[in-house]
Amino acid sequence: MIDSISALEREQIVEALATIVRPDQIDTDEQALDEASVDRFKKYQAVHGIFDAPRPAAIVYAESTDDVARVLAFANENLVNVVPRTGRTGTEGGLETSVADTVVLDGSRMKAILTVDERNMQVTVQAGAPLQVVEDTLRKLGLTTGHSPQSKPLAQYGGLVATRSIGQFSTLYGAIEDMVVGLEAVFPDGTVTRVKNVPRRSAGPDIRHVIIGNEGALCFVTEVTVKVFRHFPDNNEFHAALVDDMATGIEILREVVVGGFRPSVARLYSPEDANQHFAHFSNGKCVVVFVAEGPASIVAATSAEIQRVFDLHPHEKVEPALIEAWFDNLNWGPDKIEAEKAAMREHHHLGYTTEISADWSSVGAIYDAVMHRVRTEFPAASDLTMLGGHSSHSYQTGTNMYFVYDYDIDCAPAEEIEKYHVPLNAIIVEEALRHGGSMVHHHGIGKYRTPWTLAEHGSAYAILAGLKQQFDPNGIMNKGTIYPVAGAGIAPRG
């Protein structure tokens, strides 16, 4: 825990907030505050009623950009730490309250779809607009955002932008940073900044990227404009094959993508991970999955190329209907989260992921190194019930790798993080960096990968540090996220 540097006591903070927003916008219920002190990084502790992060002073539900500006200006003047949030789907501790008497600033009530511009193919929404609602609205018009993370039923736009998120159709549509046209954000001193909506410009550095991916450590995203695309769901074609090893699967992904084709889905599952999804047909092999999407002529050409590449490698064809049925049930909504909570209570068992990225030459070596180190060095390896991985987002220059690990928990709930999650996370991050990859692909640094932030950025860290000094000199924005700070997450290294 980090002590508050504010001269105000928590009661004084709450009293002052009540002069800035209406009383019904302030929540001080103890259970709500405890739940607001963590995110899904500590899901096992939370489900057992253990909240070891400092309890926030209050949750403030902003209803306008002006609310956000006034709350931040107050916090900045009085040195009160603020944790921004919207959909609460974070998984890396970015929503954890590391500082005593933090104010959690919630944008979920700012949920309007402001404009749908079919001529210029863009939609403008407030930070709390649920992605599922936006997508459903667009689908009625024959359009799509193309953004479909597994958190889609729960995620909201402010968090999607702030964490630099990505969706399951990224190989075709891109990640959130490829979709954002313009946005509005509020900085700690209450300054409202708008980046205008233009298709492209050459007017200095692209300042959208000061805001995109800032994880609430620099500013609060209040409004977003993203591209939209025409949607042709009836044209989708599904392809899959079984292959003998990850190296073959990686090469198949690479050949399709670098050949100039953009299937919306391009995935590779290790045998262990495949068994979680495809046990009815995977037979202990790796599974390669593609979805061709778009206008009929593009789908036909993409499908032909996928089949051509498959035929260059030993493989067993998988029936398309099996993949279509699987893909229709990938997203995580409230029902799956409640089922996971029930399982954690009853079985003391847990599953997590850590995702990295690397070039085509390195990703296989990273995968092999992680598998070897976890199996030979991780002290609790005997508690693992599954260790595997999958690639789900590919590029001209490389791909990502999700490491997936499930384990039985043989300790008190309060000890789970340190015994299991932190050391497994560390091995994956270390191997990604050792091989020249990135320690995080799309979940954000949060508060538990900060020990490696300097190693991730190297000499470019000075630029990142300069942004913090310029925009948050008082250090009130989500302390301990992105930027390593003693007392937040785990101890800084090096």
Please provide the spans of the model-predicted regions:
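N-terminal flexible segment immediately upstream of the FAD-binding catalytic core
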Residues: M1-A73, T91-M121, P271-H280, A325-G351, ...
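C-terminal substrate-recognition/cap domain of FAD-linked oxidoreductases
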Residues: D27-K43, I250-I427, H435
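Conserved, mostly hydrophobic/aromatic
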Residues: A75, G216, D472
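FAD-binding subdomain of flavoenzyme oxidoreductases
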Residues: K111-R267, A491-G494
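Activity-critical C-terminal alpha-helical subdomain
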Residues: I445-G494
